[in-house]
């Protein structure tokens, strides 16, 4: 890094440092908005929940939901570039363990190469990739996808590897479940085993999180778009291709969207930054939306705004 990761330096209208974009800027915006909303005697309750572990398994949000916490709506201030994102992808992690037979490198008659078998499988998966790309895209999220995340196998150059472990990640769309994903990968593995001699492999499921979406014309989405327009922000609808906590909230009956300052491309970067002006604008939008929602009128200008955003 060329900037101090925890320095919080201000340069040319930008805040620099680790997490500035993902998502300290969003937290700052929601806290600033909450402080202003709290001054007014509004009906209802505004809850701020700062949960941990979103980057891995979302254990913080999962615990919050299991505790019984619910609300009429939720805004997650991920970096969306001030676009309203009512949908995000899910994921399934899969491990394929290939078993070969160890032997000296000079004994091809005795060895079975587990890494070679993993390579055959990766090549066979090209057919699945083509099917996913040829399918009907989600209007906000595009196509489902997958990639090989890690591969591990072998002990020495002169030894046939008896084990190779391949970990894949499948990014899912709303409506795609874990069982269907497992069937996709198992079917290709079964077909391969029928034509590759001595192929011995086992597919197992790892961590999985669902994709989610809410209606574009819901009071939450429409209200945020209206608040954006009122604050001079182009009302934009988009999809979050990454996993975020919204799915847990939606599953528990709390409609949730992502809306926050900063560009997702800056997240996790070596020299992370966020435009300070976006934090201020985001806070203003959240304040306006909160006032309208708590007073039961989140959809002011909804028809015109939805037409413009769509």
For each feature predicted by the language model, list its residue ranges.
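Glycosyltransferase donor-binding loop in the core domain
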Residues: 21-22, 56, 241
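Solvent-exposed alpha-helices and their adjacent loops that cap or buttress functional pockets
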Residues: 8-9, 40-42, 66-69, 86-90, ...
């Amino acid at each position: 890094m060329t900037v101090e990761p925890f320095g919080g330096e201000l340069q040319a209208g930008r805040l620099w440092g680790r997490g500035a974009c993902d998502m300290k800027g969003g937290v700052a915006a929601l806290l600033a908005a909450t402080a202003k909303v709290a001054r007014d005697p509004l009906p209802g309750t505004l809850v701020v929940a700062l949960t941990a572990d979103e980057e891995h398994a979302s254990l913080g949000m999962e615990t919050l939901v299991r505790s019984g916490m619910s609300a009429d709506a939720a805004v997650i201030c991920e970096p969306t570039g001030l676009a309203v994102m009512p949908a995000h992808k899910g994921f399934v992690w899969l491990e394929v363990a290939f078993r070969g037979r160890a032997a000296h490198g000079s004994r091809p008659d005795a060895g079975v190469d587990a890494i070679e078998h993993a390579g055959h499988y990766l090549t066979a998966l090209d057919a699945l990739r083509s099917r996913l790309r040829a399918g009907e895209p989600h209007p906000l999220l595009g196509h489902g996808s997958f990639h090989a995340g890690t591969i591990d196998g072998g002990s020495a150059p002169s030894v046939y590897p008896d084990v190779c472990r391949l970990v894949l990640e499948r990014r899912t769309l709303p409506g795609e479940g874990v069982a269907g994903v497992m069937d996709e990968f198992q079917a290709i593995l079964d077909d391969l085993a029928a034509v590759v001699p001595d192929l011995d492999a086992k597919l197992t499921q790892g961590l999985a999180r669902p994709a989610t979406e809410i209606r574009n014309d819901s009071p939450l989405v429409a209200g945020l778009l209206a608040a954006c327009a009122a604050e001079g922000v182009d009302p934009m609808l988009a999809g979050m291709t990454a996993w975020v906590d919204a799915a847990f909230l939606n599953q528990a009956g709390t409609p949730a969207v992502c809306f926050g300052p900063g560009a997702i491309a800056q997240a996790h970067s070596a020299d992370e930054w966020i435009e300070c002006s976006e934090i201020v604008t985001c806070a203003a939008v959240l304040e306006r939306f909160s006032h309208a929602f708590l007073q039961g009128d989140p959809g002011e200008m909804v028809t015109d705004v939805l037409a413009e955003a769509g």
